[in-house]
UniProtKB/Swiss-Prot annotation:
This is Flagella basal body P-ring formation protein FlgA. Belongs to the FlgA family. Involved in the assembly process of the P-ring formation. It may associate with FlgF on the rod constituting a structure essential for the P-ring assembly or may act as a modulator protein for the P-ring assembly. Residues 1-21 form the signal peptide. PANTHER family: FLAGELLA BASAL BODY P-RING FORMATION PROTEIN FLGA. Keywords: Bacterial flagellum biogenesis, Periplasm, Signal. It comes from Salmonella typhimurium (strain LT2 / SGSC1412 / ATCC 700720). Pfam families: ChapFlgA.
Amino acid sequence: MQTLKRGFAVAALLFSPLTMAQDINAQLTTWFSQRLAGFSDEVVVTLRSSPNLLPSCEQPAFSMTGSAKLWGNVNVVARCANEKRYLQVNVQATGNYVAVAAPIARGGKLTPANVTLKRGRLDQLPPRTVLDIRQIQDAVSLRDLAPGQPVQLTMIRQAWRVKAGQRVQVIANGEGFSVNAEGQAMNNAAVAQNARVRMTSGQIVSGTVDSDGNILINL
């Protein structure tokens, strides 16, 4: 009889709301750690939903909307067969981000001399903070930036490879042929952006700027 009672006690403990919440929290930590690999090497997940809102199965399938952020206060869908629960979760993520190392004036270029990688809580940074230093290659500041300030994508733009009024080469490629002609750029554009060109004939064409400043058109 004592053995039976102990069995019931163990079962009650295993399936208690607290134990289930801890297990779901551990699964969520693993799930977010996998998705944040390459950005964060230290992830702390806190389940905020009450125990009565947890999924009933032991290993639910987690998902989020494609545009959802991966840290801070987020909502996660937990599915068990036909059951679907929405869980409120707080995710703390620590990793590297790009910060200003020396003052940068508006219009100034971002270089290894004036930016650096810093380590900190990604979930506490401003929106669209740059995490990959390669994203600022050939970038120009849109405002004055102070040392220590996280670099956000809204603060920078790519340097113009082509400027309005500049003479450019237009290269039209088709199946088995390539045609070159000269024209005048009608707008500023960075590499991989679209530029409109007025040809000597007066015709206006549009193409993609390459790294050499040529305008490429695929026919």
